[in-house]
Amino acid sequence: MAINNIIVVGCNIVGLYSALRCADNGYRVSIVDKLSSDKISRKNRNNYRVFNKSHHIYIHLLNRFSIKYEKYLLKYNEKTLNVLASIINKSKLIPKKSLNTQSFVKFCRSILSIADYNILKNNLEAYEHIYSNLSAMDALAMLSSDISATQEYYILTDDIGVLIDRMTVYLKTKNVEFYYNTEIRDITQSNNITYSSTRTNTFISNILILAISKDNLLKFNLLTKDQRKLLNNVSKYNIDCESIYTDKHLKNEYDIKTHLLDKLHIVCPIKKHSLYLWNYGINNIIIRDKIKHMFSHIFICGDAYSRSNFFINYSFETFDNIYSKIIHRMAHPY
């Protein structure tokens, strides 16, 4: 029976970041993952390569571990930009509740001429495939900030695996313990102590951080019906993000510097075949806050529940938003 202050479930980059923040504060931390070390190291090696100047958490992490990146130039289609600018301006006159209860596709059909709508449809890749599942409010927030033509973009020249490896080495110097091939099958909580059980062992901790997917979260019997309802406010879409949502030339590792996009792509180089999106018709700000306070000593920070699943910066932000609560719980465990 292993006893630790904090257990992190999930040895992905979000789990590593969570462990990093906790270890830097002097807490005793262990990371548990059901995969082997080799499988984890082979996973997501080409992910999260493009980011913009507003992604401060990610940039700070890259700088801390001396990860190399450079400016990345994007060339946007002027007609598309003009249509998007028109949509954004018109949306300012629409109540937020209305924007939140309809898909972006439906909203655009209601305010655009047929000609302008076709420009958008033809220049946003897989437009109706994804934007019919994204609320107008969420889409407008992303289009006016994260993938805006006015943003300054960067691209990693180092493999993301370099960051993961350096974080792992650093965590080991902080005496963080790694338990691979270890699947948490059951979670119970009693007297503000959390028990995380595997097939052969039980981890006891003051704090449990779950940096795992929605599918894996819902396997735990700990969750009540209402809690499951909260977690089901995101839906999984089987989308080949690598082929639809990325700059396809990013696959050519050494042909990046000279490439200019001639369409407005969602700049999201993630090698996933599925993506979680917030359901429209709900206020995900309120839902995220409820998930944050779902338990007293268990915290959920998987990227499915971040503000936006398209960029890793927001997954880190999800953890940062619960970090002060973790510190408080560690100082006042009972």
Enumerate the predicted regions with their spans.
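Beta1/beta-strand and adjacent pyrophosphate-binding region of the FAD-binding site
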Residues: 2-14
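Conserved Rossmann-like nucleotide-cofactor binding loop
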Residues: 14, 37, 215
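A short, Lys/Arg-enriched amphipathic alpha-helix followed by its capping loop at the start of a domain
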Residues: 17-27, 64, 174
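Glycine-rich FAD pyrophosphate-binding loop
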Residues: 23-43
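Conserved flavin/dinucleotide-binding core of flavoenzymes
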Residues: 25, 238-242, 246-334
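Dinucleotide-binding Rossmann-like beta1-alpha1 core, especially the glycine-rich loop
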Residues: 44-98
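Active-site/ligand-binding neighborhood in enzyme catalytic cores
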Residues: 92-182, 188
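Central helical "cap/lid" subdomain
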Residues: 182-254
